[in-house]
Curated annotation (Swiss-Prot):
This is Lipoyl synthase 2, chloroplastic. Belongs to the radical SAM superfamily. Lipoyl synthase family. CDD domains: Radical_SAM (cd01335). Its EC number is 2.8.1.8. Its cofactor is [4Fe-4S] cluster. Residues 104-325 form the Radical SAM core domain. It is found in: Plastid, Chloroplast. One of its GO terms (molecular function) is 4 iron, 4 sulfur cluster binding. PROSITE patterns: RADICAL_SAM. [4Fe-4S] cluster 1 binds at C84, C89, C95, S336. Keywords: 4Fe-4S, Chloroplast, Iron, Iron-sulfur, Metal-binding, Plastid, S-adenosyl-L-methionine, Transferase. [4Fe-4S] cluster 2 binds at C121, C125, C128.
């Protein structure tokens, strides 16, 4: 496993390229931090690498603002869990304020990612800050209704639901997830619901049940490239299993939109990232997000590289070129990064009525 982390990225020389697009692509690749032997030898997998310094572009102001404060108070009073808090998301201020910044100057629609099935995961992925246990508390049977009541009271048009892994439950928590979606749709039929799910241990029936619960976007993350799966994720997760989840979800409904996410900076090569993108496109995944892996603590995986904003822009353009309908790519981008903004502006307000309509066209043009 050590060797898979140490492989340098494969980059062709600029002198061998032809055309403006090729030159621009080469410059973006060259902007990425240099991969050094000393960096590769740090580890084996955890602790801080003294040679890898956090760059200025990752510095964020402390979250504040009226919208942020109001949403945080509401979530606390209702005893809801959010992945924004539990996973230490760096975008909490920006998303909860409705985009634009952590200080409350956003003018969009606030997006919070509600975490159902409790705050304790049965798996121990080496990148994740969420607490773990083999025997977490049983799910709260009132959580689906309480979550729906809370979200409906916020007046939002888009919500992201996610969950911890619950391998202790027969269906992995799929039915609980589905009940939450149905409760939301009953209280507010026009709301758009994205579900960022676990793999349900590859249980196709559980995937189908949730996919047909009324959700609008089925999201499941492959997290990293194939070669790093066993280093980064819990052994019960897997690259092919995650692809199978997304493929089955896509086939469950004609109008299903699917989404996945990849972390960068864990030791992946450019060719591996490209292959992961192609694997996702081969099963019809519509949306891809790419962001920088940030180490929650010294117990977690070491950051191998801080990818530059220019390189993230390269990956955005590359992803669009291979057919993703939308790509969000940036150092602080996460799975649910401003998800509501992307969809509300182009699905709800444009009154999408046909599954063939592209809700991302205007966003893609503007970027």
């Amino acid at each position: 496993m050590q060797s898979s982390l140490a492989r340098p990225p494969v980059l062709a020389g600029c002198g061998e390229r032809r055309g403006l697009a090729a030159v621009a692509r080469c410059r973006a690749e060259a902007a990425a931090p240099v991969w050094t032997a000393s960096r590769a030898s740090a580890g084996p997998y955890t602790g801080r690498d003294p040679e890898v310094k956090k760059p200025a572009w990752l510095r964020q102001r402390a979250a504040q603002g009226e919208k942020y404060a109001r949403l945080r108070e509401s979530i606390g009073e209702l005893k809801l869990n959010t992945v924004c808090v539990e996973a230490q998301c760096p975008n909490i201020g920006e998303c909860w304020n409705g985009g634009g910044g952590a200080g409350g100057e956003g003018d969009g629609i606030a997006t919070a990612t509600i975490m159902v099935l409790g705050d304790t995961c049965t798996r121990g992925c080496r990148f994740c800050a969420v607490k773990t246990s083999n025997k977490p508390p049983p799910p709260d049977p009132l959580e689906p209704l309480n979550t729906a009541l809370a979200v409906a009271s916020w007046g939002v048009d888009y919500v992201v639901l996610t969950s911890v892994d619950r391998d202790d439950l027969p269906d992995g928590g799929s039915s609980h997830f589905a009940q939450t979606v149905k409760a939301l749709k009953e209280l507010k039929p026009g709301i758009l619901v994205e579900c960022l799910t676990s793999d349900f241990r590859g249980d196709l029936e559980a995937i189908s049940s949730l996919a047909n619960s009324g959700l609008d976007v089925y999201a499941h993350n492959i997290e990293t490239v194939r070669s790093l799966q066993r280093v980064v994720r819990d052994p019960r997760a897997g690259y092919d299993q995650s692809l199978a989840v997304l493929k089955h979800a896509k086939g469950s409904r004609e109008d299903m939109i699917t989404k996945s996410s990849i972390m960068l900076g864990l030791g992946e090569t450019d060719e591996e990232v490209k292959q992961a993108m192609m694997d996702l496109r081969a099963i019809g995944v519509d949306i891809l997000t790419l962001g920088q892996y940030l180490q929650p603590s010294e117990r977690h995986l070491t950051v191998r590289e801080y990818v530059t904003p220019q390189k993230f822009q390269f990956w955005k353009e590359y992803g669009e070129s291979v057919g993703f309908r939308y790509v969000a790519s940036g150092p602080l981008v996460r799975s649910s990064y401003r998800a509501g903004e992307l969809f509300i502006q182009n699905l709800v307000r444009n009154n999408k009525t046909e599954s063939s309509m592209d809700p991302y066209a205007e966003i893609t043009k503007s970027n």
